[in-house]
Amino acid sequence: MTTTTSSIQDSSAAHTQNNTQPNDSTGTNTAAKNSAHVPLRVIIDNLSTNEGEVEIGVYTPENKFPDEKDKFKKYRFQPKSEQIDVLLEDLPYGELALAVYHDENNNGKIDKNFLGIPTEPYAFSNNFKPSFKAPSFDNCKFSYNEQNHVVRISLLNKRKPTK
C-alpha cells in the first residue's frame, strides 16, 4: 500500500489530494490501472462561504461508509464561489459513494454538536438527507463508468449563503 500526496490547480478550486492506493491481486497499483478512465466530475453547490476547504470522501463497497477514517480516497478543495466543479482522477469504475463537508474553519475535521450531528455544511451522493442516523452505502451509492461520470451534490447548510 502506498500513500501519495499531490497538489494541483484547476479553474474552480485549489486542490489537494491525500490518498492511499491499494494494490490488486497481481501487485499492480490500481490507480495506475485506472489512469485511462474518464475522471469523475463532481459539482457541489450551496456553499455558504469561500473560507476553509471542501472535503470529498470517496468510498467503495469495501469501505465503512461514512466512517471518516475508512475512506478509499479523500480530496480537499479551496472554494472560489458558491459552487465548485472538480474532476477526481484515478478512481475505479463501479459502485462508489461520496461524503462531502465544508470545513469552514479549516481545522481538518467535520465539527459536530454533542449529539454527533454536523454543525458544518455536509452532503452525500444522491443528495441523500439523513434523518436520525448516518446513511448507509446503499443510500448513497451510484454507478461510475464511462457513460455515468458526473455527480451533482447540494450541501445541507446551517446558515444562509453570504454574498
Residue ranges: model-predicted function:
Residues 3-59, 112-163:
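Primarily secretory-pathway and cell-envelope proteins
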